[in-house]
Swiss-Prot record:
Pathway in which this enzyme or protein is active: Cofactor biosynthesis; thiamine diphosphate biosynthesis; 4-methyl-5-(2-phosphoethyl)-thiazole from 5-(2-hydroxyethyl)-4-methylthiazole: step 1/1
Reported function: Catalyzes the phosphorylation of the hydroxyl group of 4-methyl-5-beta-hydroxyethylthiazole (THZ).
Residues the record lists as binding substrate: 39, 187
Cofactor(s) demanded: Mg(2+)
Protein's name according to its UniProt entry: Hydroxyethylthiazole kinase
Enzyme class, broadest EC rank: transferase
Organism whose genome encodes this protein: Staphylococcus aureus (strain MSSA476)
GO process terms (BP): thiamine biosynthetic process; thiamine diphosphate biosynthetic process
The EC number(s) this enzyme carries: 2.7.1.50
């Protein structure tokens, strides 16, 4: 847990431009791992914030015509400041409007990580792909989709699901931790985007080990929380997840991490 230990010592400032539904949960989750969240949205202050921040999450869950130009502006400011961006294209396949905006953003600015479920990432590379809300199709080949997205956007790809796929540095990693309860809590996936941003430490080309650890820390904490005798369902799972992120130790991490597959390709 080299990266998590560093977070707990250095408390990296992590900026989250995220959706209205999840701001509180995201901020509390970042505090639980030791990061310092700031839910700053004003382009007017971005330049000052981004000089000292370590990572930026852009999550378009509550995208509107009023905020789309602000999102592009802060992404471009982050590029100018050398601040890595984690982009979460929430429900990108649900509407033409969302898909067009996501593609515009990805043309207007360079992101360091694109994180989403298989349907969302597929929608970024296939104009015919559709989805229902933020739900993903379990039958999609996430590794193939991640590889194609990586080739298209030349950036790290994290696909979440029953198994999680990370593609970076011409490597494909499959991780097998997590809990079904994550799908029963609004904002769990959005929090993972913030956690990944907290692990970047201003690395615009993130090391794949940082991404593996970020996803594994989050999902192992979810497993432990779900197994807690006091966990009766989604309502008790959420605070237990925060507690477990706060207390997670090296022994538990090493005992539980499941890297199911490592693939190198050109």
């Amino acid at each position: 847990m080299n990266y998590l230990n560093k977070i707990r010592i250095e408390n990296p400032l992590t900026i989250c431009y995220t959706n209205d539904v999840v701001k509180n949960f995201t901020a509390n989750g970042l505090l639980s791992i030791g990061a310092s969240p700031a839910m700053s949205e004003a382009p007017e202050e971005a330049e000052e914030f981004y000089k000292v921040a370590q990572g930026l999450l852009i999550n378009i869950g509550t995208l509107t015509a009023e905020n789309e130009q602000d999102i592009i502006a802060i992404a471009q400011t982050a590029n100018e400041a050398g601040l890595p961006i984690v982009f979460d294209p929430v429900a990108v396949g649900a509407s033409t409007y969302r898909k067009q905006f996501c593609k515009l953003l990805l043309k207007s600015a360079k992101v360091s990580v694109i994180k989403g479920n298989a349907s969302e990432i597929l929608a970024l590379i296939d104009d015919t792909a559709t989805m229902k809300g933020t739900d993903s199709d379990a039958n999609l080949d996430a590794v193939t989709i991640a590889k194609k997205a990586y080739a298209t956007y030349k950036t790290a790809i994290v696909i979440t699901g029953k198994e999680d796929v990370i593609v970076q540095d011409n490597k494909a990693i499959v991780l097998a931790n997590g809990s079904p309860l994550l799908a029963r809590v609004t904002g769990a996936g959005c929090l993972l985007g913030g956690v990944i941003a907290g692990f970047l430490f201003r690395e615009t080309e993130p090391d794949i080990e940082a991404l593996i650890e970020a996803v594994s820390v989050f999902n192992i904490a979810a497993e432990v929380a779900a197994e807690n005798e006091n966990c009766g369902g989604p309502g008790t799972f959420s605070p237990l997840l925060l507690d477990t992120l706060y207390h997670l130790n090296e022994t538990t991490y090493q005992q539980r991490i499941r890297i199911q597959e490592v693939e190198k390709y050109v």
